[in-house]
């Protein structure tokens, strides 16, 4: 679904990924679980494209629900995969999820359903990424859409948001989300539950990196889009802590 001009949203609840379209050229942002590949292919066809049209794959971070079918797309298209340097090693591994946080909260019905969807969509059959390129904070990636990298560690060491200044769009990954993966509740901008973050204190501090961006449409890794100033988004997120 095209949610903004040149930005297509793909979803298998509660997991989001996106395609940036620029002059007919496509960048895939995140890549769900392995089992979501067929959903992605069908979604591409619905907008008049094929998998071969993907020119680059960029990851907000190296968790299995964001890189699940990235290697399959890379092999099918020879499109390069890009990830922040601090998550580069993790991107070459399998089973990268905050397992302790998920399993310790599996008594919650929604978290249990998230685990069930992970297993049902091939989390244990993830093909590791065999070739990936590192980027650093502040880079402007030479891929369709020219996203700006904002390193915002805490959820993972290499967590980033991708900023598209000309479009007023921030693809926030799991820096800020709008759905609680513990309860399933929808809401405004929020930091993922503390048990899901590699460094929860850092995940909270890092929000200030986004404050000066101004008004954007924020596209999270989990939940619905949100529009407003990032200063307001940060205030809302901190009010939920």
Sequence positions of predicted segments:
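Conserved beta-strand hairpin/beta-sheet module of binuclear metal-dependent hydrolase folds
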Residues: 1-47, 162-178
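Residue-level marker for buried hydrophobic side chains located in beta-strands
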Residues: 27-29, 58, 81, 169-171, ...
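Active-site metal-binding motif and surrounding structural segment of the metallo-beta-lactamase
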Residues: 37-87
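Short, solvent-exposed beta-strand-terminating loops
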Residues: 85-100, 166-180
């Amino acid at each position: 679904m095209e949610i903004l001009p040149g930005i297509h949203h793909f979803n298998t609840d509660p997991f989001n990924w996106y395609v940036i379209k620029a002059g007919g050229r496509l960048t895939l942002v995140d890549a769900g679980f392995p089992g979501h590949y067929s959903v992605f292919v069908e979604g591409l066809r619905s907008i008049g494209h094929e998998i071969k049209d993907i020119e680059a794959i960029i990851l907000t971070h190296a968790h299995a629900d964001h890189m699940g079918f990235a290697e399959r797309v890379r092999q099918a298209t020879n499109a390069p995969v890009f990830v922040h340097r601090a998550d580069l090693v993790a991107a070459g591994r399998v089973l990268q999820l905050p397992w302790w946080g998920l399993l310790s909260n599996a008594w919650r019905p929604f978290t249990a359903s998230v685990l069930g969807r992970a297993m049902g969509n091939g989390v244990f059959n993830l093909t590791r990424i065999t070739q990936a390129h590192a980027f650093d904070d502040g880079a402007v990636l030479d891929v369709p859409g020219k996203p700006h990298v904002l390193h915002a560690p805490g959820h993972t060491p290499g967590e980033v948001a991708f900023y598209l200044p000309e479009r007023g769009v921030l693809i926030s990954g799991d820096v800020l989300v709008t759905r609680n993966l513990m309860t399933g509740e929808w809401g405004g901008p929020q930091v993922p539950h503390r048990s899901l973050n590699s460094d929860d204190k850092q995940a909270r501090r890092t929000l200030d990196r986004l404050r000066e961006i101004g008004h954007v449409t924020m596209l999270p890794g989990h939940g619905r889009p949100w529009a407003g100033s990032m200063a307001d988004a940060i205030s809302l997120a901190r009010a939920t802590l």
